[in-house]
Each structure stands twice: as structure tokens, then as C-alpha cells.
Amino acid sequence: MRKLNVLSVLILMLSIWMPLTVEAQMPTLSNKNKSDWWHPIGIKPYQSSKKGIGFISVKGNKFVDENGKEIVFKGLSISDPDKLKKDGKWSKKHFEVIKSWGANIVRIPVHPISVQQRGIEEYLTLLDQAVSWSEELGLYLIIDWHSIGNLRTELLASDAYNTTKKETFSFWQTIAAHYKDVPTVAFYELFNEPTIYDGKYGTCTWGEWKLMMEELIDVVYAYNKKAIPLVAGFNWAYDLTPVKDHPIAREGIGYVVHPYPGKRKIPREPKWEVDFGFVADKYPVVATELGYMNEGDDENLLNDGVYGPSIVKYFDQKGISWVVWVFDPVWVPQMIKNWDYEPTEQGAFFKDVFQGKFKYK
């Protein structure tokens, strides 16, 4: 009888806790507010109602489609869906305009504060809409955990970027489970811009960062082996020099760089090659942010008249995919002047590149 009681208790415990171990995810607001918290509400997988585009995978230093054909991505970042929703501009039209410009990929920056305020369930509703629209339009997506700073010490650049290692891992656990077998959501940019900011955010070695990213990639792959994790280097996602001797020890990934004009002086190409370009000879590289403007307070973004043409030519030579920041009339450097989608100077330039009007030679 005693053995039976012990067995019954074990079965009861398993029935209570099994959903949490099998369907691990970010804490949901509804569960926090539920009186019967021992019956958790799980986040269900995304259900596509459309036959979308095929899966992307890594082959050597290239991204390839299901037929093995190389794809070089050229696209843009939108602003955070939470901002767009509050602006009254979150709609399929936004993605239709992007498609009409000629982009083949959209980067979605997810700020920790927007998930914290809105809650993961409601935020996933926004992402699901983006996925549905992108499926219809034939666009691929990068989901970007848009934090800046040192994840090891959890010292971040501002309240908008504040997160923890646990929250970061839980976010990707949720995304990987929710969008498993969804080819449109091709890339997971694990952490936007790692930096120790000259020690102001504490210390973190490349070895420590490498181990953390490898652990996070393992979590992603446990849920979704078809995802392509993207890993950034230090110095606000600019410096990939440690990859030469100590690459991320996981297959199927890509590397991230944010080569804004202020990072290097003219001539930039030899320095780009040393800082990140060499990585593209062996692994896929995506410049998930780049861009410029003619005036403003941020010297890192200021145009010198040659940056745009020189960087797209360099990417073309190296086979590097790229994504321009940012398709918003307020966030800088802007690609559009207003919500009539009138392009700025950089917007017009990159639109021409998307549409094949730029002459590389």
C-alpha cells in the first residue's frame, strides 16, 4: 500500500509539472494572474494557413534555399512592432511597401522593454501578424533581441534594453518553440549589440561570450534545429576579429556585424577586411545594421559621400547579406521622411540597390 501511495504521488507531481518541462517558455501574464496557477496556459505553436517560402540553411559560408541555390539577403529593419502599433502604423501595408521597394528580408527589433510592458502573449500576436504578412509577400524575417550592453554582468545601455540572461534565454526558448517549422522566420539574432563600453558595463571576454552564445544556441536547437542563430561580436556588434582563432563551436550559424560609417575612416575597405570581412570567407555574415544620414548628433552615422556605394560594393564582393537601419521617420538614421513613405537620401539610395538600379562597376 505504501508503494502505491508513493507511486500515486509521483504520478500526480508529473501531471502537474510536466507541462512546464515540456512546454517551457517565457512567463505569461495570464499565468501570473491565474488563481489556479498549477494549470498553466501554454503558448501554442504558430499555425500557418499559407504555403510560404522554403527553408534557408547554411552551406559553407553561404545561405542556400531548399534547392541549394545561394541567397544573398538585402533588406531593412523596421522599428519595434510595439512602437508601430502605438503609432497606428502596424499593418500589412507597411510590409507591402517594403516588398515594393525590393527587399527580400525584414529585421524585427524586439526591445526587452516592449515585451515586458506588453507581455509575451500579446507581443507574439504582433509577431504572428508580421509572419503571416511576410508569408503572403514572400519575405524572410530576422527576429532580433534588441538589447545593448553586457549580458554577462546584465549592465545594459538604458531601460529600453534592460534584460537578464534568464529572460534572454526564455525569450529564445519561446520563439524557437513557437516558430518551429516556420521557414519565414529564418534567423534568430540572439543579442543585438554586445559591448563592455570601455569597462563601463563591466567585463566580458570573448571566451565568456562564446560559451554563453553556444549554450543559447543549444537551447534554440533543442526546440528548432532549422533555425539559423546569428551571433554578434563586441564593440556594438562591429568587431569579429576573435572569430579567426576562436569561432563559435556550433554548426549552422551566421555572424553579425554593424559597420556604421563612424567605425572606420576612409579608406575603409582594408579595415573592414581585418575587422569582419575575413569571416565571410569561411562563414555566413549578415550586416544586420548599417546606414547613414547627412546631419545629426551621432557622429557614428554621418555620411561622408562615399559610405553607401563603398559598403554595398564591398558586401557584393564578399557575398555578405545586409539589412539597413531603419524604416521609420523618427528613429535614426531614417529611411523614410514620413508615413507617406517618401524616402530620405539613404532610403532612396538603398531602394535603388534593392531594385537593381545601382551600378556596382
Would you name each region that the model predicts?
Residues 108:
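NAD(P)H-binding glycine-rich loop region in Rossmannoid oxidoreductase-like domains
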Residues 55, 87, 159-160, 166-187, ...:
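Extracellular glycoside hydrolase catalytic/binding regions
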Residues 8-19:
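Bacterial N-terminal signal peptides
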Residues 24-105, 234, 353-357:
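N-terminal carbohydrate-binding accessory modules
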Residues 67, 71-93, 115-118, 156-160, ...:
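Acidic/histidine-rich helix-loop elements
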